[in-house]
């Protein structure tokens, strides 16, 4: 079966999907929040919710949104500044998601994590239970890295690893990465069409 057809079959049968949204899609080249795009995502998730598909969102963009809110022209390198910018931006990001989902009478729930939260057994179980209950309430859980305390992640990540870990922890049926990047590359720098296994 061709990889495109296999992908479509798996997605059609999925009951719980983790969707990761990259910063480049949330913050435009003009440096402004892409409210139309966020609304488009909310519209699609609302439609899937009508079909009883659970969607858990992993969103990047706190630093980018903070730069917008604070009218800063470029991303600083200083970690303390980045953490403060992320703290401001996270509120803006969640406001944008809230406003988009409110048009569908849906609530959103915010979960801020670090990778170590999923390494600790008790916090891992608490995370899974919280996501499950958020879905039972009919809300959309929105996960972001806790950039205000996650020093390594704020320097190197855009939540791709967090999305993969969350997908595994939640035993979701699929992980969809929405990104401005052309795709995942293997060790030979060739684009991967279908990822069957990740280590």
Predicted segments, located by residue:
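Nucleotide/pyrophosphate-binding catalytic subdomain
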Residues: 1-199
